[in-house]
């Protein structure tokens, strides 16, 4: 089983914050953005978003460019390569 699959099972399917992290990843797949714009886009508290962004970045599912408030987040190449697997895991058909 691939490392990405293990990470996704743990971070998306096997943890309390999986639904929030799924929303973050699918939104970032559409368009890279900063935490503030992301919190507005998915209607969630900024601190909640930054908490989940930190977890996703620590696990190399997203990357960031810049620093502090203007820091832009994008899905990682690692996740991009396995995005079809991610969609299957969350029940998507795209």
Q: Language-model segments: which ranges?
A:
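Short capping segments at the starts of secondary-structure elements
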Residues: 17-19, 30-34
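A short acidic, leucine-rich amphipathic alpha-helix
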Residues: 37-41
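Short alpha-helical segments that sit at the start of domains
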Residues: 1-23
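Glycine-centered, phosphate/nucleic-acid-interacting loop/turn motifs that mediate DNA/RNA or nucleotide
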Residues: 60
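Conserved segment of winged-helix/HTH DNA-binding domains
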Residues: 3, 8-9, 72-94
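Short, Lys/Arg-rich nucleic-acid/phosphate-binding segment
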Residues: 66-72
């Amino acid at each position: 089983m691939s490392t990405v699959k293990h990470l996704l099972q743990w971070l998306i399917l096997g943890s309390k914050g999986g639904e929030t992290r799924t929303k973050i990843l699918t939104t970032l797949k559409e368009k890279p953005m900063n935490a503030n714009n992301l919190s507005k886009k998915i209607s969630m508290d900024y601190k909640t978003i930054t908490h989940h962004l930190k977890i996703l970045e620590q696990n190399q599912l997203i990357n960031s460019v810049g620093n502090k408030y203007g820091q832009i987040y994008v899905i990682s190449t690692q996740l991009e390569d396995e995005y079809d697997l991610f969609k299957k895991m969350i029940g998507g058909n795209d």
